[in-house]
Regions:
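Active-site neighborhoods and metal-handling regions in enzymes and metal-associated proteins
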Residues: 20-21, 29-191
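Short cysteine-rich clusters marking metal-coordination/redox-active sites
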Residues: 25
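Short, flexible, mixed-charge glycine/proline-rich loop motifs
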Residues: 14-20
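Short "domain-exit" segments at the C-terminal end of structured domains
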Residues: 9-12
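Short, small-residue-biased leader/transition segments that mark boundaries at the very start
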Residues: 1-7
Length: 192
């Protein structure tokens, strides 16, 4: 892995060095390189020369791409908000999947999970000790005392929004409530 990173990084350095000041920029903006990303790439090259790992150009987004990702995230949040009142005792995870697929399409999105590497459903729903990527089923009925994770990814205008939400079904044990609370606190620490 370390060798692959070195090879990848050296290729990136070569790519940056091969772009002329008046060539079109690598980002696809149509602008000349010197007016677009040249100063940015020079800073990146400086970091690379000092031994830092630097991101591939594909990881660097334009303002338009960032806005597209933001809009996809908003649509994905709409889906999670929509499904919230349906997550209750007696409902099957298969029904939640159907509702999510219908609503995602209704708001102009595409359920990204559906068909991804053969995944058969539009959302991942994990109950209790299923860590992630639980497959919804009409035979899986929500019961009081369970905790549930709905992991949803929405494609909107070619961009992906991805998030999950935890739910407590009915009367949940103190241990499970603590797990959900502490997990949320940990996630919030990432954004402070």
């Amino acid at each position: 892995r370390q060798r692959q990173m070195c090879i990848r990084d050296s290729r990136k350095k070569d790519l940056i060095m091969k772009i002329g000041r008046n060539d079109k920029c690598w980002c696809g903006s149509g602008k000349k390189y010197k007016a677009c990303h040249m100063s940015f790439d020079n800073r990146i090259k400086d970091y690379w020369n000092r031994g830092y790992e630097v991101p591939d150009h594909s990881m660097i987004k334009t303002p338009e791409q960032i806005e597209g990702i933001r809009e996809a995230g908003k649509k994905n949040t709409m889906v999670l908000d929509f499904i919230t009142p349906y997550v209750k005792e007696g409902v099957s995870t298969g029904e939640l999947n159907r509702l999510i697929e219908e609503y995602t399409r209704e708001i102009g999105g595409i359920p990204a999970c559906l068909g991804y590497q053969g995944y058969p459903k539009s959302v991942c729903i994990s109950i209790d000790d299923v860590v992630c990527h639980g497959i919804p089923s009409d035979h899986q009925i929500l019961k009081s005392g369970q905790i549930l994770n709905v992991d949803c990814t929405t494609i909107y205008n070619g961009y992906f929004g991805d998030a999950s939400r935890m739910f407590c079904i009915g009367d949940v044990s103190e241990e499970k409530k603590k797990l959900v609370r502490v997990t949320k606190e940990c996630v919030c620490l990432l954004y402070t």
